[in-house]
Protein backbone atom coordinates (compact mmCIF):
# COMPACT_ATOMS: atom_id res chain seq x y z
CA UNK A 1 0.00 0.00 0.00
CA UNK A 2 1.46 3.36 -0.98
CA UNK A 3 1.43 6.53 1.14
CA UNK A 4 -1.37 8.06 -0.93
CA UNK A 5 -3.71 5.09 -0.26
CA UNK A 6 -2.92 5.17 3.46
CA UNK A 7 -3.72 8.89 3.65
CA UNK A 8 -7.25 8.22 2.33
CA UNK A 9 -7.95 5.48 4.88
CA UNK A 10 -10.25 6.29 7.72
CA UNK A 11 -8.27 7.26 10.82
CA UNK A 12 -10.39 6.24 13.80
CA UNK A 13 -7.94 7.67 16.33
CA UNK A 14 -8.26 11.12 14.77
CA UNK A 15 -12.06 10.75 14.66
CA UNK A 16 -12.08 9.97 18.40
CA UNK A 17 -9.99 13.06 19.13
CA UNK A 18 -12.22 15.22 16.91
CA UNK A 19 -15.37 13.82 18.56
CA UNK A 20 -14.03 14.50 22.05
CA UNK A 21 -13.07 18.03 21.02
CA UNK A 22 -16.57 18.62 19.61
CA UNK A 23 -18.13 17.37 22.89
CA UNK A 24 -15.89 19.68 24.91
CA UNK A 25 -16.58 22.66 22.62
CA UNK A 26 -20.33 22.03 22.80
CA UNK A 27 -20.15 21.95 26.61
CA UNK A 28 -18.87 25.55 26.46
CA UNK A 29 -21.10 26.90 23.70
CA UNK A 30 -24.19 24.67 23.75
CA UNK A 31 -27.66 25.64 24.85
CA UNK A 32 -27.98 25.65 28.66
CA UNK A 33 -31.66 26.62 29.02
CA UNK A 34 -34.18 24.25 27.46
CA UNK A 35 -37.61 25.85 27.27
CA UNK A 36 -40.63 23.66 27.87
CA UNK A 37 -42.64 25.53 25.23
CA UNK A 38 -40.47 24.08 22.48
CA UNK A 39 -41.09 20.49 23.54
CA UNK A 40 -44.59 19.05 23.05
CA UNK A 41 -46.39 16.72 25.43
CA UNK A 42 -46.66 13.27 23.82
CA UNK A 43 -48.78 10.27 24.77
CA UNK A 44 -46.47 7.26 24.74
CA UNK A 45 -46.59 3.72 26.14
CA UNK A 46 -45.78 4.99 29.64
CA UNK A 47 -48.14 7.98 29.71
CA UNK A 48 -48.11 11.69 28.96
CA UNK A 49 -44.49 12.88 28.68
CA UNK A 50 -42.46 15.89 27.57
CA UNK A 51 -38.80 15.29 26.71
CA UNK A 52 -36.24 18.00 27.46
CA UNK A 53 -33.00 16.13 26.74
CA UNK A 54 -32.62 13.11 24.49
CA UNK A 55 -29.21 11.74 23.41
CA UNK A 56 -28.27 12.19 19.77
CA UNK A 57 -27.26 8.54 19.42
CA UNK A 58 -30.88 7.53 20.18
CA UNK A 59 -32.21 9.89 17.53
CA UNK A 60 -30.19 9.07 14.43
CA UNK A 61 -27.19 11.11 15.50
CA UNK A 62 -28.98 14.38 14.89
CA UNK A 63 -26.89 17.45 15.70
CA UNK A 64 -27.05 18.35 19.38
CA UNK A 65 -27.39 21.99 20.34
CA UNK A 66 -27.35 21.53 24.12
CA UNK A 67 -24.36 21.65 26.46
CA UNK A 68 -25.08 18.04 27.55
CA UNK A 69 -25.81 15.01 25.39
CA UNK A 70 -25.57 12.05 27.79
CA UNK A 71 -28.90 12.46 29.57
CA UNK A 72 -32.55 11.62 29.10
CA UNK A 73 -34.65 14.19 30.97
CA UNK A 74 -38.44 14.24 30.77
CA UNK A 75 -41.52 15.47 32.60
CA UNK A 76 -44.45 13.14 33.10
CA UNK A 77 -48.06 13.50 34.21
CA UNK A 78 -49.73 10.49 35.80
CA UNK A 79 -53.50 10.66 36.09
CA UNK A 80 -54.37 7.13 37.24
CA UNK A 81 -51.29 5.05 36.51
CA UNK A 82 -48.40 4.76 34.12
CA UNK A 83 -47.64 1.85 31.85
CA UNK A 84 -45.54 -0.93 33.34
CA UNK A 85 -42.07 -1.73 32.07
CA UNK A 86 -38.66 -3.08 32.98
CA UNK A 87 -35.26 -1.56 32.34
CA UNK A 88 -32.04 -1.01 34.19
CA UNK A 89 -32.23 1.33 37.17
CA UNK A 90 -30.23 4.49 37.60
CA UNK A 91 -33.42 6.50 37.02
CA UNK A 92 -34.10 9.44 39.34
CA UNK A 93 -37.63 10.88 39.64
CA UNK A 94 -38.34 14.14 41.46
CA UNK A 95 -42.04 14.52 42.33
CA UNK A 96 -43.24 18.10 41.70
CA UNK A 97 -46.97 17.77 42.48
CA UNK A 98 -49.33 15.16 43.89
CA UNK A 99 -48.85 11.89 45.68
CA UNK A 100 -49.06 8.21 44.92
CA UNK A 101 -46.99 5.07 44.93
CA UNK A 102 -44.83 2.94 42.68
CA UNK A 103 -44.56 -0.83 42.53
CA UNK A 104 -40.85 -1.58 42.07
CA UNK A 105 -40.02 -5.27 41.67
CA UNK A 106 -43.19 -6.11 43.62
CA UNK A 107 -42.53 -3.67 46.49
CA UNK A 108 -44.88 -0.73 47.10
CA UNK A 109 -43.10 2.60 47.58
CA UNK A 110 -45.24 5.60 48.63
CA UNK A 111 -44.17 9.12 47.62
CA UNK A 112 -45.44 12.71 47.51
CA UNK A 113 -44.46 16.14 46.18
CA UNK A 114 -40.90 16.98 47.18
CA UNK A 115 -39.78 13.33 47.29
CA UNK A 116 -37.06 11.76 45.19
CA UNK A 117 -37.64 8.24 43.88
CA UNK A 118 -34.54 6.25 42.90
CA UNK A 119 -34.71 3.08 40.83
CA UNK A 120 -31.78 0.87 41.83
CA UNK A 121 -29.34 -0.79 39.45
CA UNK A 122 -30.00 -4.54 39.54
CA UNK A 123 -29.15 -7.56 37.39
CA UNK A 124 -31.92 -7.96 34.81
CA UNK A 125 -33.27 -4.44 35.39
CA UNK A 126 -36.12 -3.12 37.51
CA UNK A 127 -39.83 -3.74 36.84
CA UNK A 128 -41.95 -0.76 37.83
CA UNK A 129 -45.26 1.03 37.48
CA UNK A 130 -46.49 4.29 39.04
CA UNK A 131 -49.93 5.08 40.52
CA UNK A 132 -51.62 8.38 41.38
CA UNK A 133 -53.54 8.62 44.65
CA UNK A 134 -55.97 11.29 43.33
CA UNK A 135 -56.96 10.79 39.66
CA UNK A 136 -58.72 14.19 39.66
CA UNK A 137 -55.35 15.88 40.18
CA UNK A 138 -52.46 14.55 38.07
CA UNK A 139 -49.10 13.76 39.60
CA UNK A 140 -46.30 15.70 37.92
CA UNK A 141 -42.63 14.83 38.04
CA UNK A 142 -39.32 15.20 36.27
CA UNK A 143 -37.16 12.13 35.59
CA UNK A 144 -33.42 11.94 34.89
CA UNK A 145 -31.43 9.09 33.34
CA UNK A 146 -27.67 9.29 32.84
CA UNK A 147 -27.23 7.23 29.69
CA UNK A 148 -23.66 6.18 30.54
CA UNK A 149 -24.92 4.38 33.66
CA UNK A 150 -27.98 3.11 31.81
CA UNK A 151 -25.92 1.63 28.98
CA UNK A 152 -23.19 0.35 31.32
CA UNK A 153 -25.90 -1.81 32.90
CA UNK A 154 -26.78 -3.25 29.45
CA UNK A 155 -30.30 -1.90 29.78
CA UNK A 156 -33.10 -3.29 27.69
CA UNK A 157 -36.52 -1.61 27.70
CA UNK A 158 -39.29 -4.22 27.98
CA UNK A 159 -42.86 -2.89 27.93
CA UNK A 160 -45.08 -5.15 30.08
CA UNK A 161 -48.31 -3.10 30.04
CA UNK A 162 -49.10 -0.05 27.92
CA UNK A 163 -50.69 3.10 29.27
CA UNK A 164 -54.44 2.76 28.55
CA UNK A 165 -54.54 5.95 26.42
CA UNK A 166 -51.63 4.95 24.17
CA UNK A 167 -52.56 4.16 20.57
CA UNK A 168 -50.04 2.53 18.24
CA UNK A 169 -49.44 4.54 15.09
CA UNK A 170 -49.68 2.64 11.82
CA UNK A 171 -46.26 1.93 10.30
CA UNK A 172 -45.48 3.61 7.00
Descriptions of predicted regions:
Residues 94, 106-123:
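Short acidic-glycine-tyrosine-enriched beta hairpin
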Residues 102-103, 152:
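Short loop/beta submotifs within extracellular cysteine-rich repeat domains
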Residues 1-68, 156-172:
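A short, N-terminal "cap"/entry segment at the start of jelly-roll beta-barrel domains
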Residues 93-94, 118-119, 134-154:
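A short hydrophobic beta-strand segment most commonly corresponding to one strand
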Amino acid sequence: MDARSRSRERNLYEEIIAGQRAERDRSYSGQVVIRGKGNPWVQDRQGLVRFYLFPSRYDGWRPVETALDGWIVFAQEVRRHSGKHRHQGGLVIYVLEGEGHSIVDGERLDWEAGDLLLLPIRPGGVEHQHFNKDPDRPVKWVAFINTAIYEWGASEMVQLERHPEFRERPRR
